[in-house]
Amino acid sequence: MKKLLNTLYVLTPESYLFCRNENICVQVGGTEKVAVPALTVDSIVCFGKMTVSTPLLEFCGKRGIGVTFLTQSGHFMGRFYGPVSGNVLLRKRQYESLNEPAFSRNLVQSILFAKLRNSKLVLLRAARTTKDDSTHNDLLAGAELLTQSAARLPSCETIDAMRGVEGSAATAYFARFDLMMQNNPAGFCFTTRTRRPPRDEVNALLSFTYMLLTREIQSAMETVGLDPAAGYLHTLRPGRPSFALDLLEEL
């Protein structure tokens, strides 16, 4: 089993990143602020204007450490990673499977089963921790709706039908999202899921986190030789990592 490592987030503008021996170092204004052992890191995320030394990029490329560049406000600019490996025959088989309806349906069903199961577990965990009876019952009702939605998936004959089941389940889940945030220290609240643009702090955080996860999934796919754009649940669209978005659904 692969060991899960850390992500180094660099938030200070005008930082300078370089490597020394087996350490990833961050310097600000000529003063070294931190040195992190590379063996504990599998990705670096840089916010805003900063400089990354060429030797560090070479160092990261050889060790499979991805470097993501975002604007100060969190918009994705680009990502660096080392040589793409993987079996070309795997990618060939992936393309062939796009034209196999039974394979596509089974894969999408598995993805959505996992999504509904994980969403249900989140609701049940919140129900166990709340002290309010009304909230507890509402969260349990939401979990039951997700169970019923999952039970409907095997009877869906098309991927479009499964998308409809997933959409209804997502509505039930997000209708209870604010209940899981009660009494949070920051005072955040959630009304409804909004995108492009997200219209409040919680939606902005959700979209930002999804973006980071999508890039991580995309990088992992390319590393093993899969095409992140060749998706099954999300339709094919130029410039969109549809397959990475498919797997993101489970999270």
Predicted regions span which residues?
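Active-site helix-to-loop segments that bind/position phosphate- or nucleotide-bearing substrates
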Residues: M1-R20, G29, A35, L89-L251
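A surface-exposed, charged beta-strand/loop segment in the N-terminal or early-internal portion
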Residues: T40, G48-L121
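Terminal-proximal segments
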Residues: M1-Q72, G82
